[in-house]
Amino acid sequence: MAKQVEKLVKLQIPAGKATPAPPVGPALGQAGVNIMGFTKEFNARTADQAGMIIPVVISVYDDKSFTFITKTPPAAVLLKKAAGVQKGSGEPNKTKVASVTKAQIKEIAELKMPDLNAASVETAMSMIEGTAKSMGFTVTD
């Protein structure tokens, strides 16, 4: 008989820096997962993406084993890195904090394509542009 998925745990963890401390430990402890096993495997798999926040979806099975899928970093994190700022604007429609180019938007859209619900790069670019505008960034050619 196939293993049944008992629980899905979604987290955003800095690449290569998963530790048993919160938020990882409590979330996985409640599901009965081997926390050290997860942290070692996650850190090994994401070591090349240092400095990024990596979303991860952990499938916990009824025998307490697990598998996980790492996704691409959130668009907001990629935009902040591209613009070289720490955080977006508190009032995005009034105060603009940075600007990003269409080329940077296209690069981010191509990177995020596997995780976005978009049929083409152009559609993905408009999604990323919307995120940029809601963060108080201006989009330039």
Curated annotation (Swiss-Prot):
The lineage is: Bacteria, Bacillati, Bacillota, Bacilli, Lactobacillales
Described function: Forms part of the ribosomal stalk which helps the ribosome interact with GTP-bound translation factors.
UniProt-listed GO biological process terms? translation
Oligomer and partners: Part of the ribosomal stalk of the 50S ribosomal subunit. Interacts with L10 and the large rRNA to form the base of the stalk. L10 forms an elongated spine to which L12 dimers bind in a sequential fashion forming a multimeric L10(L12)X complex.
Q: Which domain of life is it from?
A: Bacteria
Task: Fetch the Gene3D superfamilies from UniProt.
Answer: Ribosomal protein L11, C-terminal domain, Ribosomal protein L11/L12, N-terminal domain
Q: Which UniProt keywords apply?
A: Methylation, Ribonucleoprotein, Ribosomal protein, RNA-binding, rRNA-binding
- Is Coiled coil included in the keywords of this UniProt record? no
Listed InterPro entries: Ribosomal_uL11 (IPR000911), Ribosomal_uL11_bac-typ (IPR006519), Ribosomal_uL11_C (IPR020783), Ribosomal_uL11_C_sf (IPR036769), Ribosomal_uL11_N (IPR020784), Ribosomal_uL11_N_sf (IPR036796)
Species, as recorded = Lactococcus lactis subsp. cremoris (strain MG1363)
Post-translational modifications reported in the UniProt record: One or more lysine residues are methylated.
Identify the gene encoding this protein.
rplK
Protein's name in the database: Large ribosomal subunit protein uL11
Q: Which SUPFAM superfamilies match?
A: Ribosomal L11/L12e N-terminal domain, Ribosomal protein L11, C-terminal domain
Q: Which family does it belong to?
A: Belongs to the universal ribosomal protein uL11 family.
